UniProtKB/Swiss-Prot annotation:
The lineage of its organism: Eukaryota, Viridiplantae, Streptophyta, Embryophyta, Tracheophyta. This is Transcription factor EAT1. InterPro entries: bHLH91-like (IPR045895), bHLH_dom (IPR011598), HLH_DNA-bd_sf (IPR036638), MYC1-like_bHLH (IPR045896). Belongs to the bHLH protein family. It comes from Oryza sativa subsp. japonica. Residues 261-310 form the bHLH domain. Residues 261-274 are annotated as: Basic motif. The gene is EAT1. Disulfide bonds: none annotated. GO terms for biological process: anther wall tapetum development; pollen development; positive regulation of programmed cell death; regulation of DNA-templated transcription. Disruption phenotype: Male sterility due to failure of tapetum programmed cell death (PCD) and degeneration required for pollen maturation. Male sterility due to delayed tapetal PCD and aborted pollen development. GO terms for cellular component: nucleus. One of its GO terms (molecular function) is protein dimerization activity. It is found in: Nucleus. Residues 338-357 are annotated as: Disordered. The keyword Nucleus applies.
C-alpha cells in the first residue's frame, strides 16, 4: 500500500502498525493526531443492512465502481475527487507519516529509493500537484545473493569440457551451473545480474529456432540421439554411410535418404528373389508325371523321387541294350558253331562266348516306379524277367477286370494274384513274368494301369 511519497512494507516491525489496524477511533494512538493528510478531502458513504439488501443500490454501486476503474485506466494522473469525511475513521484508513518516515529511516536502501521517487515526482510534476505512486519495479536494483559461487562454465569446468553449450556466443551473462554429485547440475545466478528488462534481446535463441525446420523440436528424438557423439570434442553428428553432417537438418535428411534408399532396395531385391523362386518351383512341378501337392516341401520330395526313378530307368535301359546286343552276338556264335560242326572243325569262339555270358549274368535288370493319382496308387518293380505290381484304389466295381486287360496288352504271364480290402480301398498284388522277346518297362506298365483305372472311375461318375 503506497500513500503519498512513501511506501508500506509488511515485513517491518508489526508493532508500528497496531494503531492503524484498530477499528475504534478512541483506541488509536496519540501519534495519529499529528498526521499531515487532510482528512477533509475524503468521505466514505455510510452503508446499512437495508441499503445492501436493496437491488437498485447494489446495481448503482457496481456501475460506480466500473466507472471509477475505467477512469483510473484511462488517466492515472487524474486527481482524486474530494469526498465527504463525515464517517471517515482515520485509525482504519490512514497511515501516519511518522510510521512511514520511521520505516524509511531504518534501511539505507529505502532512503535511496525515496530519493529516487522524489526526483521522479519533481521531474514529472514541478508544480507539486498530487500524483500516483510510480512503478517501483523499474527503479529498484534487486541484489540477489547467489546460492553457489558464480562460475563461468556450464556442465562442469571449462578445462574438462572445453565448450559451453548454453553460452555459445558469450551472450548469456550472470548464469552459471554448478556440478552437484547427488542430482547432476544446479544453476546459480551471479550478483551482478539485473532484473530489469533489456531492450536488446540476444540473438542466440532466435538463431537456434530459425535453424530448425518447422514443427521440429529443439531436442532430437531417441533415434536421432543415437547419432550424437563427441560432445566434449565438438563433433555433433556421427558419420552415416561414410557421410558427415554439420547440422540437425542435414543429419535428419541424410538419415531419411539413407534408410529409404536401402530399405526400398532390400525390399525390392527380396521380393524379386521370392518371385523367381516361385516361378522355378512351378516349372519344376510341371516336369513331374504325377505331382502330389503345391507346397515347396512336397515339390522337393517329388523331385527326389523322380530323380531316383530316372536313375533306375537309365540303368535298366543300359542292361536291356547289353542283353539285346549279347543276344544278337550269341545267335551269330551259335550259327557259326553249327556250320563248323557240320564241317568237322572245332570252334575257337566258345571261350569268348563263355566270358560274355558270365559278364551278362552278373548284371541283373532291376527297376522301380511309383505313380499316384486321385483315386489310385500303382507300384511296379522289375527284377530280371519278373514283374511285381501292387495296385491300390478306392472301392469300385470291375477293378480287377481292367487290370487284367492291361497285363494282357504287355504279354505278361500271370503267375500269382492276391487281393484284399482295407477300409475303403481295394488292394491287388500281381506276380508276372516277362515273355521272351518282349520289351517291358516299369514306367509304361504303371502309366497304363493308372489310365485304365481313372477312365473307369470317370465313366462310373458320369453314369451315377
Amino acid at each position: 500500500m503506497i500513500v503519498g511519497a512513501g511506501y508500506f512494507e509488511d515485513s517491518h516491525d508489526q508493532s508500528l502498525m497496531a494503531g492503524s489496524l484498530i477499528h475504534d477511533s478512541n483506541q488509536a494512538p496519540a501519534s495519529s493526531e499529528n498526521t499531515s493528510i487532510d482528512l477533509q478531502k475524503f468521505k466514505v458513504h455510510p452503508y446499512s443492512t437495508e441499503a445492501l439488501s436493496n437491488t437498485a443500490n447494489l446495481a448503482e454501486a457496481a456501475r460506480a465502481i466500473n466507472h471509477l476503474q475505467h477512469q483510473l485506466e484511462i488517466d492515472l494522473e487524474q486527481e482524486v475527487p474530494p469526498v465527504e469525511t463525515a464517517n471517515w475513521d482515520p485509525a482504519i484508513c490512514t497511515i501516519p507519516d511518522h510510521i512511514i518516515n520511521h520505516q524509511f529511516s531504518e534501511d539505507p536502501q529505502n532512503i535511496l529509493v525515496e530519493q529516487q521517487i522524489q526526483q521522479y515526482d519533481s521531474a514529472l510534476y514541478p508544480n507539486g500537484v498530487y500524483t500516483p505512486a510510480p512503478d517501483l519495479l523499474n527503479l529498484m536494483q534487486c541484489t540477489m545473493a547467489p546460492a553457489f559461487p558464480a562460475t563461468t562454465s556450464v556442465f562442469g569446468d571449462t578445462t574438462l569440457n572445453g565448450t559451453n553449450y548454453l553460452d555459445l556466443n558469450g551472450e548469456l551473462t550472470g548464469v552459471a551451473a554448478v556440478p552437484d554429485s547427488g542430482s547432476g547440475l544446479m544453476f546459480a545466478s551471479d550478483s551482478a545480474l539485473q532484473l530489469g528488462y533489456h531492450g536488446t534481446q540476444s540473438h542466440l535463441i532466435k538463431d537456434i529456432c530459425h535453424s530448425l525446420p518447422q514443427n521440429y523440436g529443439l531436442f532430437p528424438s531417441e533415434d536421432e540421439r543415437d547419432v550424437i557423439i563427441g560432445v566434449g570434442s565438438g563433433d555433433l553428428f556421427q558419420e552415416i554411410d561414410d557421410r558427415q553432417f554439420d547440422s540437425v537438418l542435414e543429419c535428419r535428411r541424410g538419415k531419411g535418404e539413407f534408410g529409404k534408399g536401402k530399405g526400398k532396395a532390400n525390399f525390392a531385391t527380396e521380393r524379386e528373389r521370392r518371385e523367381q523362386l516361385n516361378v522355378k518351383f512351378r516349372t519344376l512341378r510341371m516336369l513331374f508325371p504325377n505331382p502330389t501337392k503345391n507346397d515347396r516341401a512336397s515339390i522337393v520330395g517329388d523331385a527326389i523321387e523322380y530323380i531316383d526313378e530316372l536313375n533306375r530307368t537309365v540303368k535298366e535301359l543300359k542292361i536291356l541294350v547289353e542283353q539285346k546286343r549279347h543276344g544278337n552276338n550269341r545267335r551269330k556264335v551259335l550259327k557259326l558253331d553249327q556250320e563248323a560242326a557240320a564241317d568237322g572243325e572245332s570252334s575257337s569262339m566258345r571261350p569268348v562266348r563263355d566270358d560274355q555270358d558270365n559278364q551278362l549274368h552278373g548284371a541283373i535288370r532291376s527297376s522301380w516306379v511309383q505313380r499316384r493319382s486321385k483315386e489310385c496308387h500303382v507300384d511296379v518293380r522289375i527284377v530280371d524277367d519278373e514283374v511285381n505290381i501292387k495296385l491300390t484304389e478306392k472301392k469300385k466295381a470291375n477293378s480287377l477286370l481292367h487290370a487284367a486287360k492291361v497285363l494282357d496288352e504287355f504279354q505278361l504271364e500271370l503267375i500269382h494274384v492276391v487281393g484284399g480290402i482295407i477300409g475303403d480301398h481295394h488292394i491287388f498284388m500281381f506276380n508276372t513274368k516277362v515273355s521272351e522277346g518282349s520289351a517291358v518297362y516299369a514306367c509304361a506298365v504303371a502309366k497304363k494301369l493308372l489310365q485304365a483305372v481313372d477312365v473307369q472311375h470317370q465313366a462310373l461318375d458320369i453314369f451315377n
